[in-house]
Curated annotation (Swiss-Prot):
Annotated GO MF terms: metal ion binding; monooxygenase activity
Subcellular location: Secreted
Residues involved in O2 binding: 166, 175
Residues involved in Cu(2+) binding: 20, 91, 177
GO cellular component, as recorded: extracellular region
EC number annotated for this UniProt entry: 1.14.99.56
Functional description taken from the UniProt entry: Lytic polysaccharide monooxygenase (LPMO) that depolymerizes crystalline and amorphous polysaccharides via the oxidation of scissile alpha- or beta-(1-4)-glycosidic bonds, yielding C1 or C4 oxidation products. Catalysis by LPMOs requires the reduction of the active-site copper from Cu(II) to Cu(I) by a reducing agent and H(2)O(2) or O(2) as a cosubstrate.
Organism expressing this protein natively: Malbranchea cinnamomea
Biotechnological applications: Lignocellulose is the most abundant polymeric composite on Earth and is a recalcitrant but promising renewable substrate for industrial biotechnology applications. Together with cellobiose dehydrogenases (CDHs) an enzymatic system capable of oxidative cellulose cleavage is formed, which increases the efficiency of cellulases and put LPMOs at focus of biofuel research.
Protein name listed in UniProt: AA9 family lytic polysaccharide monooxygenase C
């Protein structure tokens, strides 16, 4: 009996872990790059646990303390860049992408993206049907975004964020799975990205896109947290 209970517990734990995500790989020109080669190693590298405190400084890139250095990948403005997850996305919720420009003369890998430096470039939420909401990102292992064509040349952090909303009916129940890739954009334009926000600071735990009951009382429309998407 004890063996059966232990086996059931292990299966349950494994199932929960498999529903969690990390994004260790950039996808550029159709090629999946190496684990953490161009992505800052995240603190949940082994645990796969999501963040639940939107006021934590870990909301920037969820970096692992003392992480090894990552390199910078050159990408073209207007091109499609992606992140690969090490497991299919099981939890329902939106995916958002942000960028932050590294100041000229600063080392990309050691730069801390504090203050109002982040601008949103894409967000993907649910699709409404007669049976309720469906989430196009569910069960996906690769998520893509187009780098804005008019973004100025330079070094940037590209931040992916998937918000799991299965327990979002409680304050602190939403789980944030995120990572930051390090890219150098070439062939860009003279756009002025914005509005810019900070992490932490861009979200509140009671924002309607973070605190909501998708099981008992789902809202008519999903409200994304954070700023408007820059139409660059």
């Amino acid at each position: 009996m004890k063996a059966a209970v232990s086996l059931a517990l292990l299966v349950a734990v494994a199932g929960a872990a498999s529903a969690h995500n990390i994004f260790p790989n950039l996808i550029v020109d159709g090629t999946v790059t190496g684990d953490w080669e161009f992505v800052r190693t995240t603190a949940n590298k082994w645990s796969r646990e999501g963040l639940t405190n939107v006021n934590s400084e870990s909301m920037r890139c969820y970096e692992e303390a003392g992480r090894p250095p990552s390199e910078v990948k050159t990408v073209k403005a207007g091109s499609r860049v992606g992140f690969a997850s090490q497991a299919p996305i099981r939890h329902i919720g939106p995916v958002l992408f942000y960028m932050a420009r590294v100041p000229d003369g600063q080392d990309v890998d050691s730069w801390t993206p504090s203050g109002d430096v982040w601008f949103k470039i894409h967000q993907q939420g649910p699709e409404r049907s007669e049976s309720g909401w469906t989430w196009p990102t569910q069960d996906q292992t690769e998520l893509f975004v187009d780098i804005p064509a008019s973004v100025p040349d330079g070094n940037y952090l590209l931040r992916i964020e998937q918000i799991a909303l299965h327990d979002a009916q409680y304050v602190g129940g939403a789980q944030f799975y995120l990572a930051c890739g390090q890219i150098n954009v070439t062939g860009g334009g003279s756009g002025d990205p914005g509005p810019k926000v900070s992490f932490p600071g861009a979200y509140k735990p009671t924002d309607p896109g973070i605190l909501l009951d998708l099981h008992g009382h789902p809202p008519a429309n999903y409200q994304f947290p954070g700023p408007a998407v820059w139409q660059g």
